[in-house]
Amino acid sequence: MLPSENGDEDQGSQKPKRAYLRKGEGTARFRMTRRSAPLTSSPAINLPRFTPTNSAPSSARTIDSGIPHDDDTRPPTTASLPLDQPSVLESHDSGNRSESNERREEDNVEVVSAMQSYVPGDRSSSVLETCSKVSEEATQLRAEADRITAQANFINSMKSVSITPSSYSSNISGPIYQSTPKGSLRHDDLSDDPTFLPPPLVPPRNHSPQTLSSLASSGSLDTPQARPLAGNRLNMMVQNEAQTGISLLNNPRRQPMLPAHHHPSQKENVPERKAPSEHVYDEPLQIQRPHRRNREEQRQKHNLMLQLRDTIAHLDYASECVWSTRKKQEEAYAKRMKELEEDFESKMQMIQEDNTSEEERLKRERRDIERDRKILQKGIGEREKEHTQMIAKLREKLSNSESQNAKLRQDKRAVEEKMKKFIEENEKLTKDLNRNRATCQRLEKHIKQLRTEKEKDDREKEMFAKVAMNRKAAASGIATGSAASSRLPSVSSLASSMKTGSTGKGRTVSFADDEPEEQTLEAGEETMQPEFIMRPYETKQSRFGTSTMYRDSIGETTRVTSTIANGLLFEYSNGDFRWMNRQNSVEIYRIAVDKSIIVNLLQYNISFIYFFQRQLEVWRPGNNTTLISVKRREVRTELHCENGTYYTEMFDRNGRYVTKDFCRPEVFKDIPPGSACSYRDGGTRYVEYTAPEDFELVEPEYRLRWYQGKVMVCKIIKRPRCNEKTLRVQVDVTTGSGILEEVESQLKDGQSQKTTVFPWS
């Protein structure tokens, strides 16, 4: 029958014992017997993966350290020690030791720390060699192993088996030589393997071997250890549980039960039994009702085996680190030796080369000395003869050198002449290239101009065709719906022309401020994307007024300036600008790419569009249009629409004009200077003619003066009963620069007072 885990039946009969592991020590701090020899100076190494918070290793030697398992000097592992097999021969009297013996044993115990003091950076594994030196501790362990082997032989004769569930299942694999609790053990198996460590069943002190033999033979050992296993599965379970005690760390701790009575000398140890411990103390099966002393010893043995296993793993890890460091040092040594050998070989090669050159020099000097010695041995006549021959050779050598120098000078002059020709040809080609580039640019401009003129001619032909079709429709009595149309081109077509002309802008700009509502030619159908919304980030005072800089999320900027004449000036980052008054009646837009200027009178549906150095277009309601050309033969073309019929007046630079329609023949007339012509709307709109290139368009909303193809001046008259100012727009036809001015209604000294709103160039 298995004993109770809480040990309730022994609370009143056993005295409390001091906990073997003190509070806070854990598996990293353990006790070991004092030795007379001094402790080793090598640092202890802590292996974090063996702590309870980490995953448990599969064996005490999880590192391939290279130390064979048959090494006698190695301490036994957990699997080879008696972990879960309690003694079947311990009697009740073994727990009645005196308190003085317990104190003597505790005094012979010291606390050893296995915390980490040095962990190398490189954790590479290496093969470790076996240790050839047998220490004193290894000798003691070997003697202990012999003693345990003798005890195991006695136990095997009893044919008993342990089914103690003192440890829980674990995934730790045992070493090569491990105890096998499956079935009964034979004496010859133990004698063949000297490293086999069966359970340490030590007979109690108050029983002799004869007494134990009599107990075993009399059959009084009626305990679970004396009965065989029920089946193979239980046998395998016991074998797995007996391999290691690391499963003690994976199970929750049972609350210790304090005995009812305590010994007076151990009252100070009672709080220590309340302290939590990371070990689960097993209660193995006993032959009869065991004393608490036996269970304490079993627990101490179990904890010592766990500490021994961790210490072996730490030693293996330290040995592996040492050997990895040795391997690194050997590699560094080999590398350094190789470098030194290469350096030595290079230096030896340099020395050999120096020796060779020195030997050659000595040979030359030796030859010269030998020649001089022979000359000195000869007579005066022979010396003079040799000197004469030497002089002749030197002269011949000199003449050859001079001829070679002359040839080289000649070649040099030829090369210089050739290089000079190349330089001249290169300069000529460079000039031709520059001239051709200029010609190409001029031709490109000419082609562009021709293309523009062709587009204008096509547009005029289309206009004339439209007039002809309308005239035919009127002659045939078919009603037309042109009276309901506003003007040509419409606002949408003008907006499209503005968008195509502004290649640099290419998008609509809005502002986050509460600016006055504006009706631009770009209709509001386009949906603004969030990155195109501009927000103010800088405000300062400029020469035209207070200006605010706006910026969107993609880096585009726009400067908005509040000007006089109750207007706003928008300057875009691509060079375009737009001015409009707060009444949304006048709008001026300039495109920086082609220097085009657009003036819109939004309340009257009138537009002025000036294309730089090409023409000026005036669009009125009812499809009445005026085209003023800068370089064409016809300086002005008037398109009239009356009662759905169209006719055209074309004025040339000689002072003559011709009227064209599809009902009457063409009429050529001369215009007297100072007269009026081109009447519209019952005479309210007309043109005052001064010269072929000097005329003024007089209309109720504005006055437009064209002066000799150099200056265009447009005076925009303010609306009655509105808080507006009369504006004057002047544009230089040749340069594209201009100015916007505010005109006062009152005259001073017969002259109108003008104030500059803003200029542009």
Swiss-Prot record:
Residues 1-11 have a biased composition (Acidic residues). Residues 164-173, 479-497 have a biased composition (Low complexity). Residues 51-62, 210-223 have a biased composition (Polar residues). Residues 1-109, 164-228, 252-280, 479-510 are annotated as: Disordered. Residues 90-106, 265-280 have a biased composition (Basic and acidic residues). It is found in: Cytoplasm, Cytoskeleton, Microtubule organizing center, Centrosome. It comes from the Eukaryota. One of its GO terms (cellular component) is centrosome. Residues 129-156, 326-464 form a coiled coil. Keywords: Cell cycle, Coiled coil, Cytoplasm, Cytoskeleton, Developmental protein. Required for centrosome duplication. Plays a central role in determining centrosome size. This is Spindle assembly abnormal protein 4. The gene is sas-4.
